[in-house]
Amino acid sequence: NEGEGVKHFYQVMSQTMQRLSDFDFELVCVDDGSKDNSLEQLISISKQDPRVIVLEFSRNFGKEPAMTAGIDAASGDCVIPMDADLQDPPALIGDMLQKWQGGAEVVLAKRVDRSTDSYSKRTTALMFYRLHNALSHLQIPENVGDYRLMDRVVVDALKQLPERQRFMKGLFAWVGFKTATVEYARDARLVGDSKFSGWKLWNFAIEGI
């Protein structure tokens, strides 16, 4: 349900792809059972731009299945999952690609400033990482979300994992590979409201463990 921001997202991504014209891009967009006009807008854009590929779910399956489907459908030499709200800045993609060209197989995007998040969201996020890392032998890096670059070899390794109930942050950490990090301050959400509440994040942490 990102209908308010779909056009803006595409405009920003189109500008980003133009700026990085040395690379060939595809934009795989997953509609996770939206109830607004997100899907119609995405289909309209895809008819005008063949780089845009739209995956339509029959209902809302949730964040992890949607991300898995997008990663599985991507055909590039590297894959960068990201949300449509642009809080994770596309401007960082150039830095990620530079690290990748330098030999990194995974490039993490680490938030160094979460001042645009509410107090409750910052607190819940901190609890999420601390709880998971205290109870699990598999450590996930703090303040690193799903926004990252993964080489094709990493994507292929993820696709071979048998888990049906997927906790992607854990799977990302599990597969390993040579990793680099870029740091950034997260932007405020420009349009719409977050669909991921603190309660969902808490349940997410328990499920991940």
Predicted features by range, described:
Residues 10, 21-33, 55-56:
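Short beta-strand/loop segment that forms part of the nucleotide-sugar
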Residues 17-23, 46-51:
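Short helix-capping segments at alpha-helix termini
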Residues 4-8, 36-45:
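Acidic helix N-cap motif at the loop->helix transition within catalytic regions
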Residues 2-18:
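Short, well-formed alpha-helical segments that are part of the catalytic scaffolds
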Residues 31-40, 86-87:
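A conserved acidic beta->alpha catalytic loop
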Residues 26, 51-53, 178-180:
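Conserved beta-strand segments of alpha/beta enzyme cores
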Residues 44, 51, 55-59, 63-73, ...:
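Acceptor/aglycone-binding surface of glycosyltransferases and processive sugar-polymer synthases
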